[in-house]
Amino acid sequence: MCCSDASERLPKLRRAKQALWLLHYNTGFPKTEYPLVPNLVEIRDLEFAYGDRKILSNLRMDFPRGKLIAVMGGSGCGKTTVLRLIGGQIRPQRGEVRVGGEAVHKLNTEGLYRLRRRMGMLFQFGALFTDLTIFENVAFPLREHTNLSEELIRNLVLMKLNAVGLRNASKLKPGEISGGMARRVAVARAIALDPELIMYDEPFAGLDPISMGLTASLIRNLNDALGSTSILVSHDVNETFAIADYVYFMSAGKIVAEGTPAELRVSTDPYVKQFVNAEPDGPVPFHYPGKSLADDLGLGTQR
């Protein structure tokens, strides 16, 4: 009986090995080999503005291979703009962004398309196709960017969904699952092509504590399992500090502090201290700048 079982398993093992071989060598998956520079992403002396409104100023950041790096700061400080520059959606006025040694702003349309196939992106609110099933959402990048057979696509999608705990929900549509589950589907889609770089834009926004903790664990575990480099933009201190290797703090388009989560928890920098401890007043004031209340009430000159 055992020999019979073994003989039945051998063809399955061969098919599995063949599938893996096809996946990596003969399927249409991008075959770009980036130079093995220590930092997968480098930002140097970067300036970016919308017209006269300066968004980023003299930015310098490193994102080492295999690490999970967080970019934190208040709303409007330029965090998401950094992700858009890395993805080549916008171009800097000065300085450069390099991914795998390539200057992103110098790439033509074909070069950008090739580069983006090596990236995974989790958008702030998932951006799932609401008229497609969960399975079809995750299958979408595989069908767009590879020549895999439907059988292989099916197996890969089910494996990705299994990794986020939603294989048995594959036939449902996004409107039939919770917001936390939808975020996990978006994670599965982001890793569909086993990207070298994964960018997460506010992955914890709007999630309940259970979904938030689960999503944080997924991001860390997937980063390590895939050997990818992850860039995490977030406001959520506890979840981000629990999984990040290194953190950049931004304010008004500049890096105001950086370090490991442990270092930043004990930082004496006023901005970092206010942000980490959720203090209501500090470098980011409670009151909008302007006249004092006494002046506004006409009491400023009274004795």
Predicted region positions:
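Conserved ABC ATPase signature
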Residues: K173-I177, M181
